[in-house]
Amino acid sequence: MTDQEQQQLTAAGNEMSASFLAAKKRSDATLAKLEAEPGKFTMLTGDRPTGRLHLGHYFGSIKERVAMQNRGVNTNIIIADYQVITDRDTTEHIQDNVLNLVLDYMAAGIDPTKTMMFTHSAVPAENQLLLPFLSLVTEAELHRNPTVKSEMEASGHALTGLLLTYPVHQACDILFC
């Protein structure tokens, strides 16, 4: 750690930790590389089609997705229609929600000529990766996942085993893109 970083760390009222400063330094370096050569980067993001998007979605992530797309970053957006059934009682509105999600993305500035948008259900090969991936993790590991644990606690009702596969499905998403 440099003297300047140490002074920043110990300055009165400064609550940043050394690990935060190191992470910020790495983030700043990555951002500089992104600005210089955006085409060397790939962004993978997505949403579950559970309803219409709102301002929170826009300011929380979609605005930045549009900016990254317009910088020239290879942009992939998953519409995680299979993941909706992990914690929902019905699949009745999924098709309408997928269509509305795409329309909302486009209205917010996502350009389908610059960004690949796809649903899980449209890519059988991605879902076929799920079985061999599941053979690499134990049931106990799936139950220890903090996101899965909080979803189970928050649901208030019994959930299907599909929720346990959610993080493994996300690993398949990453390999696909």
Where are these regions (language model features)?
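NTP-dependent nucleotidyl-transfer catalytic core
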Residues: 1-177
